[in-house]
Each structure stands twice: as C-alpha cells, then as structure tokens.
Amino acid sequence: MSSEMAAKSVKAFGLALKDSSGLFSPFNFSRRATGEHDVQLKVLYCGVCNFDNLMRRNKYGRTKFPYVFGHEIVGVVTEVGSNVKKFKIGNKVGVSFIVDTCRECERCKIGQQIACKKAVSSDGFFETPGYGGCSNIFVADENYVILWPENLPMDSGAPLLCIGITCYNPLRRFGLDKPGVRVGIVGLGAVGHLAIKFAKAFGARVTLISSSPGKKDEAFQKFGVDSFLVSSNAEEMQAAAETLDGILDTVPVVHPLEPLFALLKPLGKLIIIGEPHKPFEVSAMSLMEGGKIISASTGGSIKDTQEIVDFAAEHNVVADVEVIPVDYVNTAMERLDKADVKYRFVIDIGNTFKSP
C-alpha cells in the first residue's frame, strides 16, 4: 500500500462487543483505505460461528474490545486497487478467517496458511488489529479473497467459508472423497450436517454416529445417511465394528475415542475436527491394532476455499441456515449457548444494517 493510501481511511460501522457484558451494539470505526492490492466489498451476509460466541465470552482469553466478529463474509466488490488483477467492481466475493500471512514460511508454502505464525485474521484473533465482517464494508488483500460462484446462494453459502472448509478439506486430504467409501460422521450439528452433505456429494456411504437416538429420523429423512449408530448402544456399535474407512469427529467436547477406533477398518482414519478444549486420552494399542490413524484438521488454504465453493455450486451443497436481522444478534448468541439453531445463523447485513 502506498504511503498516501495508508494515510487515508474509510468510515465503517458494525456491531461490536465493547466490554465484558457479552452484548453487541452499534459501533462506528475506520477501515484502511483500499490499497493497490486491495479489494473493498459491501458486505451482504455474514455467518455466525460458534467461535464468535466463544470470543464473546472470552473463552480463549484473547478477546480485545471493541470486538467486531465475523469471518464468513460474503458481499459485492465496490472498489479495487490499482494493481488488483483477480477482481472487478460488481464481482460477488467471499472472505474467510485468514486475511494475510507471511507468504514465505513452510506452512504457507504447503497451504497451511491458517497455521502461519504471522497470520492475520479477519477479526483480530491473532494479536493484530482487525474488525470482523459484521459490518457494512470490508477491505482485504485480493490474495485472500475468493470469487463467489454466480449460482451459489450467498446466505446459505456463507458458512462454507468456515465450517464448510472444516469438513470438506479432511475428506479430500484423507482420501474419503471417493464413491463407495464408507465414512462415519460423529455429531449432527453445524459442522456435522455439512460433513454429511459433502460426503454424500462425493458418493460416499455415510454413517451418522450420535449420542442422541432422537436424531435418527432427521438423519435419514433430511440428510439421507445410509446408516445410524447410537454411540451409547454397545450392541449397535459392536455390529458395526471395522466397517468404516474413515471418521470425521465433529464433537467439540472431550468424549471416548476407543469406541470410534473399533468402527474403523484396518488402516482406517479418525480425524478430529471438533476442537475440544481439553486433551483426549488415546490408547496407542487401539491404533496399533490394524494400523489405524488419528489426525486432526482445521480450515484450509485460500485455494482450498475457492475449490470448496466451486464444488458446492456444482453439487448444490449449502448449509441449513436461519437468516436473521442485525438486531437479532444478541438473541442469536444466547441461543448458541443452548445449541438452539438448525444449523447456522446468517446475518442479513445488506438489508437490515443501517448506519447508526
């Protein structure tokens, strides 16, 4: 960015958490002016992630006030810098969690930008200034912006920028994206419901593993799973022993892993994507028997993110969402505390957010 552009800024407004009350309220602030490699977009939709709610409650110990949340950002380009090559005014675009990295370290080179030690997040999580996407405009380097497919809905597509890549990437990375592969999904929440949709789009045979017997009908009728296991039903679990090529575990709290290992075929893979905040207990013997593998995955590169929205547009994969107005955000956060949403809140910024 030139010194002249750096000296300028543009007025913006959003919703901010200004103190430890846990309540968001209107907030006027400044974003950087559009630099020569930047794209400015009018934000139309922004997904509400459980991460945003954890930041609201300072569960990571890293929340800085004022905190403007939002990293599932979809909108329309309104301005481009003089050296921008990938976008033009009027393009539909998306911005996810990472908006800059060093671009030189080994992590960046292998597509693990989310793990770059100099990563900059859209909402300021990584000890760097930043205001998230729950605002009227956003400015980002073009290299961290994706082109939004014309036939992909912007509201129900917004969560693909976070939870979508969270489940899509490990399916691809661990070879669970082939027709006929048997994939287990643990948990039918925000991540789990999209994991089912992507696995089915790949042609996999999907087993939902849940602690809630009451989710069986929904799993079959709404999401078209091929089988359903109640994790506490020892007889069902035993009957399904060594039937799965891989399992995506989406549950965000610590739970027993041994029953899941037993479901895996020899050389099967258990991939943790639920981000529990306490350590698991794992028996090495359970893995050694059959050469089973445990791994973890979170997020993906900008290239991965572009790939996922293109795939989703081609295969009609979107999240099940509840679209809400801006003034409903505090209520939505309270409902997230109770897991009371099917399956993702998305804020209609474009139609319901007016300058305070």
Swiss-Prot record:
Disulfide bonds, paired cysteine numbers: none
Binding positions (NAD(+)): 187-192
Binding site for Zn(2+) 2: 102, 105, 108, 116
Residues that span the membrane, as ranges: none
Keyword Transcription attached: no
Distribution of this protein across tissues and organs: Expressed in leaf epidermis.
InterPro entries, per database record: ADH-like_C (IPR013149), ADH-like_N (IPR013154), ADH_Zn_CS (IPR002328), CAD-like (IPR047109), GroES-like_sf (IPR011032), NAD(P)-bd_dom_sf (IPR036291), PKS_ER (IPR020843)
Catalytically driven reaction(s): (3R)-3-hydroxy-16-methoxy-2,3-dihydrotabersonine + A = (3R)-1,2-didehydro-3-hydroxy-16-methoxy-2,3-dihydrotabersonine + AH2; (3R)-3-hydroxy-2,3-dihydrotabersonine + A = (3R)-1,2-didehydro-3-hydroxy-2,3-dihydrotabersonine + AH2
EC number: 1.1.99.41
Record protein name field: 16-methoxy-2,3-dihydro-3-hydroxytabersonine synthase
Species of the source: Catharanthus roseus
Gene that this polypeptide is encoded by: T3R
